[in-house]
């Protein structure tokens, strides 16, 4: 990894907010104290998506991130999981507006698939039950290559959800993970790889899996020595490397 870990942590501590500083101190092995309030989370547990509205997909991703940094037992994680359970639709799925789906979407149903995949992965990682209908819905959205209706980000989340729902090495999980290796899009960058790795870390996919190994190596090679101008991306990359190493 070309990233200077100590230098990047110092940048976060000097330029980041309280939440980033808390994470940086923990990564550096220092006493970080109590977890501060997480930016973007409302008082009932939901996290804001790209539009600023509370989003099941964004909340699922945030809950997976808390699992990644070993904070799944924190109050912020507990109320996020509670909020997700409360947001289940009558069809036992979850729903986001298309504008709240990250990346390039390829289907009008992307909001439903993204929200359901991210939430299913997060709830299973948090030892909660998303219900059998949620994963049955997701399985019906997977094509013969392993791609999921809605695009890249729903496929990343589905891979983690399938690993947890069906077990390691099962067909749905491996199809989705293979798709991420064999059908990579030109527009994918460090943000896409870091997001995928967050879902996969929460799901417990091991570092030796070919998809994890490839994405982690690409993330390492893309990192500037001083880190990205996006402090959140820099900090997340450091957390992912620490987790998988």
Briefly describe each language-model feature range.
Residues 1-245:
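Preference for long, amphipathic alpha-helical scaffolds in soluble/luminal domains
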């Amino acid at each position: 990894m070309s990233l200077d870990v100590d230098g990047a942590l110092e940048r976060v501590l000097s330029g980041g907010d309280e939440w980033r500083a808390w994470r940086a101190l923990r990564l550096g092995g220092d006493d970080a104290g109590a977890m501060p309030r997480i930016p973007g989370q409302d008082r009932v547990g939901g996290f804001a998506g790209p539009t600023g509205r509370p989003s099941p997909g964004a909340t699922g991703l945030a809950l997976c991130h808390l699992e990644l940094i070993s904070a799944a037992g924190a109050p912020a994680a507990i109320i996020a999981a509670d909020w997700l359970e409360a947001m289940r639709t009558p069809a036992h799925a979850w729903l986001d507006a298309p504008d709240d789906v990250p990346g390039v979407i390829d289907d009008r149903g992307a909001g439903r698939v993204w929200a359901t995949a991210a939430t299913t992965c997060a709830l299973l990682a948090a030892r909660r039950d998303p219900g059998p209908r949620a994963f049955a819905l997701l399985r019906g959205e997977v094509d013969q290559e392993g791609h999921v209706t809605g695009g890249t980000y729903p496929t990343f989340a589905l891979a983690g959800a399938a690993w947890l729902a069906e077990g390691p090495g099962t067909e749905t999980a491996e199809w989705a993970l293979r798709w991420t290796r064999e059908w990579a899009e030109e527009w994918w960058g460090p943000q896409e790889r870091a997001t995928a790795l967050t879902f996969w870390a929460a799901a417990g996919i091991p570092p030796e899996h070919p998809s994890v190994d490839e994405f982690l190596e690409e993330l390492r090679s893309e990192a500037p020595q001083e880190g990205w101008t996006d402090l959140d991306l820099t900090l997340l990359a450091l957390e992912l490397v620490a987790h998988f190493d």
